[in-house]
Amino acid sequence: MGKPGGAKTRTAVCLSDGVFFLAGAFMSLTLVWSYFSIFSPSFTSLRHDGKPVQCSGLDMQFDPSEPGFYDDPDLSYSIEKPITKWDEKRNQWFESHPSFKPGSENRIVMVTGSQSSPCKNPIGDHLLLRCFKNKVDYARIHGHDIFYSNSLLHPKMNSYWAKLPVVKAAMLAHPEAEWIWWVDSDAIFTDMEFKPPLHRYRQHNLVVHGWPNIIYEKQSWTALNAGVFLIRNCQWSMDLIDTWKSMGPVSPDYKKWGPIQRSIFKDKLFPESDDQTALIYLLYKHKELYYPKIYLEAEYYLQGYWIGVFGDFANVTERYLEMEREDDTLRRRHAEKVSERYGAFREERFLKGEFGGRGSRRRAFITHFTGCQPCSGDHNPSYDGDTCWNEMIRALNFADNQVMRVYGYVHSDLSKTSPLQPLPFDYPNEAW
């Protein structure tokens, strides 16, 4: 039988050893924690009120109480009143809202719009709704905010001039965005993976689809298309808008600008001054001032005239399916939130160095149904019957296939919007 005293001695020794072990472990953890506190980077920054802000997200509930440019009663959103020192104002806003700084150089707000009244064309409202859905889909996939305007912001700035007041107001409402991306209501994203190469435009403040030689050699009003453009949120752009609108209906000299434009650009169709010809006029007459800062993009369809695009939907679909048959990475199911990863993979694996345009392996980025007038229905008389509406539906379904595939469905027939066809696993290797 063991002695009671001997058992007590062994227990005391074990407890003593345990205390020393725990003390040593605690000291080790304290040293490790201290080391990382000194040498590890901090992932927080200070707000204007001194409170920390996590850099992992935008702090959309914080706005300092100190007065900023928004509190200036002289600041006007109106197209009639110029904005000054906008770069300084934006910088001050970022200083007081530091969580918005990371990634701001590539931040985009998409802006679009349509008329405020119902469409005369029986199918018009449906087409505009679907065109808006198309833009919302693209914006959601790529993390862009989007603003839709269906009201005139100035009673005189209507029709094609209505975009300028909206763009200016969006610039003021979104100082966190580096780019405002205007997209006409009848322009449809037909490549949901492609992203504008913003790095290419680092030295430019306006990006528009166009060709320099057609401006300076042929003097054509179709040298660029002002229905889709990226404009940098900066003072230069504010000044451009102020000059640009001076040829519009808000100007007392509006009536004289139509004849002046037509005297230079002989093929101009409209007798009155329009926004597109006005921009070309500025480039033509003041090349040294505007051309260095305006990027005329022609390497891909920033906007592609629909007549040159719609007949290729079947061929381009097959070309993209061939890429997916060749590499199973593109057939892999994935969450919509990581779709950009697969678009980047396709770009690097199959499309690097491939220019856009007719005959290209690329899908047209944006297909613009210029002249179709889906709301009024008064399309260009050279277009046959319902060709405009039928091809808009096909283009929308072509784009929707790229969206709905992530949800497990596609349109098997581009002319039919509903119902959709469920996709088999490993499509297109596994046929329907």
From Swiss-Prot:
<dbReference type="InterPro" id="IPR008630">
    <property type="entry name" value="Glyco_trans_34"/>
</dbReference>
<comment type="similarity">
    <text>Belongs to the glycosyltransferase 34 family.</text>
</comment>
<keyword id="KW-0735">Signal-anchor</keyword>
<dbReference type="Pfam" id="PF05637">
    <property type="entry name" value="Glyco_transf_34"/>
</dbReference>
<keyword id="KW-0812">Transmembrane</keyword>
<keyword id="KW-0472">Membrane</keyword>
<keyword id="KW-0333">Golgi apparatus</keyword>
<protein>
    <recommendedName>
        <fullName>Glycosyltransferase 6</fullName>
        <ecNumber>2.4.-.-</ecNumber>
    </recommendedName>
</protein>
<dbReference type="GO" id="GO:0005794">
    <property type="term" value="C:Golgi apparatus"/>
</dbReference>
<dbReference type="GO" id="GO:0000139">
    <property type="term" value="C:Golgi membrane"/>
</dbReference>
<keyword id="KW-0328">Glycosyltransferase</keyword>
<dbReference type="InterPro" id="IPR029044">
    <property type="entry name" value="Nucleotide-diphossugar_trans"/>
</dbReference>
<keyword id="KW-0808">Transferase</keyword>
<feature type="transmembrane region" description="Helical; Signal-anchor for type II membrane protein">
    <location>
        <begin position="19"/>
        <end position="39"/>
    </location>
</feature>
<dbReference type="GO" id="GO:0005802">
    <property type="term" value="C:trans-Golgi network"/>
</dbReference>
<feature type="glycosylation site" description="N-linked (GlcNAc...) asparagine">
    <location>
        <position position="315"/>
    </location>
</feature>
<dbReference type="GO" id="GO:0005768">
    <property type="term" value="C:endosome"/>
</dbReference>
<feature type="topological domain" description="Cytoplasmic">
    <location>
        <begin position="1"/>
        <end position="18"/>
    </location>
</feature>
<keyword id="KW-0325">Glycoprotein</keyword>
<feature type="topological domain" description="Lumenal">
    <location>
        <begin position="40"/>
        <end position="432"/>
    </location>
</feature>
<keyword id="KW-1133">Transmembrane helix</keyword>
<dbReference type="GO" id="GO:0008378">
    <property type="term" value="F:galactosyltransferase activity"/>
</dbReference>
<comment type="function">
    <text>Probable glycosyltransferase that may be involved in the biosynthesis of xyloglucan.</text>
</comment>
